[in-house]
Amino acid sequence: VTLGYAGDASYFLVYGTIAEGLAQAGGTLAAQVKVARLLSQGEALPQAAMGWNAVGLNVVPVFNPSMGYVNYVVPAVFVLILHQVLLLGTGILGATQNQRSGRGEQGYWQQVPVLALLLARTLVVGGLFVLPVTYFFGFCFDYYGIARTAEPAALWLFTLPFLLATTWLGVVLGALFTRRDLPTQVVLISSLPLVFLAGFIWPLELIPTPLNWLAQWVPSTPAIEGFL
């Protein structure tokens, strides 16, 4: 007996659930048929049960105890949210100052050295995200029951370069535009491609090499790989 099934894999969550359910149902039906055949041949029930599956599989998940998408997808989404919001805020700040300078307005950003302005913006904007990082990686992880194997010190040691790189990328993004609405459009449009290029939803082996190379320049991509 051949059991065939097909589905639209573009809906990967629905497709995965349906495919797993059909595979389990087919395996159970095949086991029942084989056990019934062995019983009809005079085999005892314990021997017949062992006959169709002599080797048992004991799966022990290490990094994803629930074997679900919460432990796998949610942490990556948290990292992407932090990245996009920080990038958006820093980019809007820089673009707003460029827009005001274009109208002939004077501001503090024109009266201080570039390195001093960059240092101040890094400390202020990056420092503001200490609280969101604590909320996402602390309270939210505990609330959703997400497995966490890293020590707090190691987590912060990895978070620091992520915040620095994202802040500086936002500074570069803000310097490229003279209208404050443009960084918002760029960040929003880039969100979905960054999700698929990060490698936790779509396999990296199936992503074109040029796109994968470009994605490595965005802080969220190596950060998601490192956190997961």
Positions of PLM-derived features:
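Transport-system extracytoplasmic interface segments
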Residues: V1-G89
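Alpha-helical membrane and juxtamembrane elements of multi-pass inner-membrane transport
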Residues: G16, V55, Y72, A116, ...
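Short amphipathic alpha-helical interaction/hinge segments
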Residues: V33, R37, L86, G102, ...
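Juxtamembrane loop-helix boundary motifs flanking transmembrane segments in multi-pass membrane proteins
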Residues: A49, N58, V62, S66, ...
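Hydrophobic alpha-helical transmembrane segments of multi-pass membrane transport proteins
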Residues: V60-C140
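Membrane-spanning alpha-helical segments of multipass transporters and channels
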Residues: G127, Y135-F139, A147-L228
